[in-house]
């Protein structure tokens, strides 16, 4: 997918909400800077719970919410389905609300203020231009020599994540892979119901619960991990399988 396709599809997600569509498209068109990445209708988790923000700029940790005078952004989606989507931890992020109950001129004034704010943030930060080709490329992180959760690292395939850690796979589909440190496992879980497994992540994203719904198999699984620590690694680097904003599969660090 190139930038043109990405941008058109992102803007197309707002078409069923007239005020959101107006504000979001006006911001993007007036900003006119495609070194800046944006995501529409981004699921986020905050200390007070999960929500849906209308426009997200990941390079700045900035969220724009279109306020129509009602709390329409709360997440109204089945819990199991929500567990599949790519959710951004917005703790510490900045949120700007656009009040569309005001006059047309006042709405446009708010948008202009947002444009100025983004341009200033770009000048005041160690800004890295959005490169749609390199952001999912393992070579990007191999050259850096590290990955950091603050960089929102994700890969399109399991093999790409594995290749960041010394592998040279052309394809790989298993949920676990070796790491140069023999005490560490690369793990690619689905954090939603998947066959007999129902893995979950806590609301604060601090703990992953690995659970088999078959009680006998669950007991064997737990006992094996406790008794054979040479075979079963207790330290894991996790890339969870999620659905990206455009429905694509990603493995998010």
Regions found by a protein language model. Give the residues of each.
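Acidic, glycine-rich low-complexity segments with interspersed aromatic residues
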Residues: 149-249
């Amino acid at each position: 997918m190139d930038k043109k396709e990405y941008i058109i599809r992102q803007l197309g997600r707002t078409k069923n909400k007239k005020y959101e569509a107006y504000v979001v498209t006006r911001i993007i068109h007036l900003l006119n800077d495609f070194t800046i990445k944006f995501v529409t209708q981004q699921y986020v988790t905050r200390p007070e719970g999960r929500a849906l923000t209308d426009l997200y700029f990941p390079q700045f940790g900035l969220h724009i919410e279109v306020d129509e005078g009602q709390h329409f952004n709360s997440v109204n989606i089945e819990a199991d389905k929500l567990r599949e989507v790519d959710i951004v931890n917005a703790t510490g992020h900045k949120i700007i609300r656009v009040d569309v109950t005001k006059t047309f001129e006042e709405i446009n004034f708010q948008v202009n203020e947002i444009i100025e704010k983004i341009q200033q943030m770009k000048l005041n930060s160690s800004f890295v231009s959005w490169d749609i080709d390199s952001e999912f490329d393992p070579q990007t992180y191999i050259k850096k020599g590290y990955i950091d959760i603050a960089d929102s690292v994700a890969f399109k395939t399991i093999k790409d994540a594995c290749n960041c850690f010394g592998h040279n796979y052309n394809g790989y589909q298993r949920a676990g892979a070796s790491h140069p440190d023999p005490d560490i496992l690369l793990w690619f879980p689905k954090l939603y119901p998947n066959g007999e497994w129902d893995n979950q992540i806590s609301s604060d994203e601090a703990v992953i619960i690995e659970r088999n719904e078959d009680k006998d198999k669950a007991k064997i699984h737990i006992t094996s991990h406790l008794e054979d620590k040479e075979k079963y690694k207790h330290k894991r680097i996790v890339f969870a399988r999620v659905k990206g904003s455009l429905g694509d599969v990603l493995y998010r660090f």
